Amino acid sequence: MSRTDPIRDKGDIQRLKNHFLKKGELRNYTMVTLALNTSLRIGDLLQLKWEDVYNFRNNQYKAHIAIQEQKTHKLTMILLNPEAKDSLTLLKNYTEGLFPELCIFKSRIGKNRPINRSRAFNIIKQAAIELGIEGNISCHSLRKTFGYQAWKKGVPPALIMSIYNHSSLEITKRYLSIDQDDKDEVFLNMNL
């Protein structure tokens, strides 16, 4: 299995999101935005239904997504931040016949099935290639990007480990993909 990289440059993150917006691909825009802002694995993300994020009785977004992760079987609570909610709103306003059990990332094939992981992979991989984003970029890159960008903002690795539901700090450190440029930046900023 090849190693995937996080998207290190914030400009590249924005270009990836804008790529789908400009093309009017709101499902793909929302998929990327939610993946970047929730740290969910793509398999868990694609299974989301509108009732997981939206309270139809109160007509408002839920504060958190409560999900049992497919890989770890652990229950996790993820806050829906404003960026995630805004992307969901764009898609919600565009979606015809919205009902609670409707898949958020609905495939054109079948009545109410999500796109599959390989389709999501191809969507993200192709966009990264078209945009010239450096690294081996895939669906898992979006999860890694969350951790990398959180770490760059000063979030302690132990907290990122907890968010990821990792069993060890070593796994989280590998996810962060810290490279020589990151190490050099620490030395440049010390100036003691």
Feature roles, as predicted:
Residues 47-75, 84:
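Conserved tyrosine-mediated DNA breakage-rejoining catalytic core shared by Y-recombinases
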Residues 44-46, 136-137, 147, 155-166, ...:
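Active-site-proximal segment of tyrosine recombinases
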Residues 48-50, 74-75, 112, 152, ...:
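Catalytic phosphate/metal-binding cores of nucleic-acid and nucleotide-processing enzymes, i.e., regions
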Residues 70-89, 101-124:
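C-terminal catalytic core of Y-nucleophile DNA break-rejoin enzymes
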Residues 67-69, 164-189:
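Catalytic-site neighborhood detector that most strongly recognizes the C-terminal catalytic loop/helix
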Residues 1-13, 74-82, 98-101:
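DNA breakage-rejoining catalytic core of tyrosine-based enzymes
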Residues 10-42:
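Basic, Lys/Arg- and aromatic-enriched nucleic-acid-binding interface segment
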